A protein has these predicted regions:
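Short, flexible helix-loop junctions that flank or precede catalytic/ligand sites
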Residues: 2-155
Length: 155
C-alpha cells in the first residue's frame, strides 16, 4: 500500500469521513464505504487555541484511529453517528479523543481559558456541565484527562 497524507477543511473526524464519501456519486457509496473503512489508518484533527497567557497557541487535537470498530461504523451509515461516542470510550484503549476532550484537558492543565475552550468546542454545553461537576452515566472524560505528571498528548 501507499502512505497518503491529506488535508481536508472540515470541523471534525465525522465530517471528514462524510466529506470523503461525498467525493463519489451516491450510487457508488455502498462500494466506497468498505474500501474507505479498510484503507483508513486514522484521522487527526487540529484546532489551534490561544494560550492562557496570550503568548501563543496550543493544539487541541481530535484523533480517530482505524481499527475493527471504526471499520464497522464507517461501513454502516446507521452507525456513523456512534463514531464520536467510540472516540470518547476508546481513549485509553485506542488513543482516540474528541476535540472537546482535548479542550477540557487543556483547561484543566491550565494551558487555555475556559472561554476559549467553549468558543472552540464542538459541544460547548458538555464542557460547561463537566466543569460544573455534573457527570453523565459514565464519566468518560475522566479516564482520559491527564493527571499531574502524565500526558496522553504532547502540548
Amino acid at each position: 500500500g501507499h502512505l497518503v497524507l491529506s488535508t481536508l477543511h472540515t470541523t471534525d473526524a465525522l465530517q471528514t469521513v462524510n466529506r470523503m464519501l461525498s467525493l463519489f456519486p451516491p450510487d457508488q457509496h455502498s462500494e466506497i464505504r468498505p474500501l474507505r473503512s479498510h484503507n483508513l489508518g486514522g484521522i487527526i484533527g487540529l484546532r489551534l487555541i490561544p494560550t492562557k497567557d496570550g503568548t501563543g497557541r496550543v493544539p487541541a487535537c481530535e484523533v480517530l484511529v482505524g481499527c475493527a470498530t471504526t471499520r464497522e461504523y464507517l461501513q454502516d451509515p446507521k452507525k456513523m453517528g456512534s463514531i464520536r461516542d467510540f472516540m470518547a470510550e476508546g481513549a485509553t484503549v485506542y488513543g482516540t479523543c474528541t476535540f472537546d476532550m482535548s479542550l477540557l484537558a487543556l483547561v484543566q492543565l491550565g494551558k487555555i481559558r475556559l472561554e476559549e475552550a467553549l468558543a472552540s468546542a464542538t459541544y460547548p454545553d458538555e464542557i460547561r456541565l463537566k466543569m460544573a461537576g455534573i457527570e453523565g452515566s459514565e464519566n468518560l472524560l475522566d479516564t482520559w484527562i491527564p493527571r499531574e505528571g502524565e500526558s496522553h498528548v504532547s502540548v
